[in-house]
Amino acid sequence: MDELNNGCSSFRLWESDAPGHKVGLDVPTLRYYPASHKVGNGTVIICAGGAYQRRSPHEDIGYAEYLNSIGLDAFVLDYRVTPYEFPHALLDARRAIRFVRKNAEMFGVDPNKIAIMGSSAGGHLAALTSTYKNVIDGEGIDDIDAVDFMPNAQILCYPVLDVQGHKYSFEVLLGERFEEHKKATPMLLADENTPPVFLWHTATDACVDVNGSLRYCQKLHEFGVSIEMHIYPVGIHGLGLANDNEHNCPYIQGWANKLEAWLKEFNYTNS
């Protein structure tokens, strides 16, 4: 465990090299942001967006600080991006959930109240983690991998859910294996066992088509999965909390309050 400058702690997800590690490239880590005044024992693992090319800070640290402000511990997953390809980011997300669940007592969280949250391509990763059930090469190497990897809930912000939504994210994720995109498409993998979802999007998102979110929630509804969806009539892509100088949209800021109420409904907080 390493202490970071802002007071949070950073954990390597594997003690030795991660499966598929490339020398000189990113090491997948999990940054822990504990709430100073906890009001519940749920927690959220955050995956920033960035088309699998980078990770956008306003969609990870910003979310962590917001979750801390409502009394929840949060984790930011520094998952692997290009030149890594599928399934490395998924492997990292599964490992993060297993790591937190394995160490739930140490973190003071309920192992059955671990949500995964993501925006844009990070939303794709969160949804894929919630729907992909096949074993991945590199799993099963230690006792952490024996722990269940499925999150208990998914929080999706303007997510990429299929090729129609944002083809480029799939091209970066899959590289020369783009023709295999169906195996990495949450829309096609969802079933009656998919975790409950909170999702928001804007109807005028010119980057990631809102219709993917509509189709995903419709499919989950047909399977009997609990959904809460908010579609705002106007708004650009990548707003995050919609409250900073670059992404300021007061009307859309209300999604965070709706998320807080949803988390309370599912007993992640008790405020």
Predicted segments, located by residue:
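Conserved alpha/beta-hydrolase "acid-adjacent" motif
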Residues: 206-215
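Short beta-strand/loop motif that positions the catalytic acidic residue
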Residues: 199-201, 205
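Catalytic nucleophile-loop/oxyanion-hole region of alpha/beta-hydrolase
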Residues: 55-57, 62, 75-111, 248-252
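Active-site glycine-rich loops that stabilize anionic/oxyanionic intermediates
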Residues: 48-53, 203
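Primarily recognizes the serine-hydrolase "nucleophile elbow" in alpha/beta-hydrolase
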Residues: 95-173, 177-182, 186
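N-terminal cap/lid segment of alpha/beta-hydrolase-fold proteins
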Residues: 1-39
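Short beta-strand element of the alpha/beta-hydrolase
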Residues: 41-49
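C-terminal catalytic histidine-bearing segment of alpha/beta-hydrolase fold enzymes
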Residues: 31, 214-271
